[in-house]
């Protein structure tokens, strides 16, 4: 009997170990944060501001009093109240009539749709400014190229001036070339004159022959 007792003991301890392992899971599931049962801070602020009858808006001190009267712990959630006011102002549900940031007076916005529409319109209007600034820079670069094109005709004018100078020099050469032609004509005239002299010489012998014939007749 003493040998069988140690064998039965481990079988009993195994279910206890499984139960101990399951308990931490339940504890971990119970450690999840619970959702707040009451309304959020922003909802409480909007209700308090809408309930106020002040024309200039509800101040921060009056808002805290209204929230404390509703059972909200203002001292612990002071930072949450300020953040809630800022978010409501940025969304357009509340309008800040006085002060800056969380301090000041706040009033319920009667036309929240208009403020959202204005905010959306302002954002697209700011975007076209960037391309408009780039266009003048591109336009300023283009005139530089045009100026470079204007400079190139000046270079073209210089060859034209050189051509006119060459054309002016060429008539001088033509006149020089023309002078030898006159000298070439003068020898022709000289050649034409020489035969006349030859004719005169030929005429003189004829006259001499005639004189000789006359003497013979006598």
UniProtKB/Swiss-Prot annotation:
Keywords: Acetylation, Chromosome, DNA-binding, Nucleus
Biological-process GO terms, alphabetical: chromosome condensation; negative regulation of DNA recombination; nucleosome assembly
Species name: Gallus gallus (Chicken)
InterPro entries: H1/H5 (IPR005819), Histone_H1/H5_H15 (IPR005818), WH-like_DNA-bd_sf (IPR036388), WH_DNA-bd_sf (IPR036390)
The family this protein is said to belong to: Belongs to the histone H1/H5 family.
Annotated positions of the N-acetylserine modification: 2
GO MF annotations in UniProt: double-stranded DNA binding; nucleosomal DNA binding; structural constituent of chromatin
Compartments (UniProt record): Nucleus; Chromosome
First and last residue of the signal peptide: none
Protein name: Histone H1
Keyword Acetylation: yes
Low complexity composition bias: residue spans: 1-19
């Amino acid at each position: 009997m003493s040998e069988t007792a140690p064998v039965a003991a481990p079988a009993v301890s195994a279910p206890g170990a499984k139960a101990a392992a399951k308990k931490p899971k339940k504890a971990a599931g119970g450690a999840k944060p619970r959702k707040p049962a009451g309304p959020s801070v922003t909802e409480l602020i909007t209700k308090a501001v809408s309930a106020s009858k002040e024309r200039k808006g509800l101040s921060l001190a009056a808002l805290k009093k209204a929230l404390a009267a509703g059972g909200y712990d203002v001292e612990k959630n002071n930072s949450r109240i300020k953040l809630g006011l800022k978010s409501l102002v940025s969304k357009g549900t509340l309008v800040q009539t006085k002060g800056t940031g969380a301090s000041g007076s706040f009033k319920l916005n009667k036309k929240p749709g208009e403020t959202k529409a204005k905010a959306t319109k302002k954002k697209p209007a700011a975007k076209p400014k960037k391309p408009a600034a780039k266009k003048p820079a591109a336009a300023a670069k283009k005139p530089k190229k045009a100026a470079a094109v204007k400079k190139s005709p000046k270079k073209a004018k210089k060859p034209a001036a050189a051509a006119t100078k060459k054309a002016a020099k060429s008539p001088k050469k033509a006149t020089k070339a023309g002078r030898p032609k006159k000298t070439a004509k003068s020898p022709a005239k000289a050649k034409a004159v020489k035969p006349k002299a030859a004719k005169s010489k030929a005429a003189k012998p004829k006259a001499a022959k005639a004189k000789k014939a006359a003497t013979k007749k006598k």
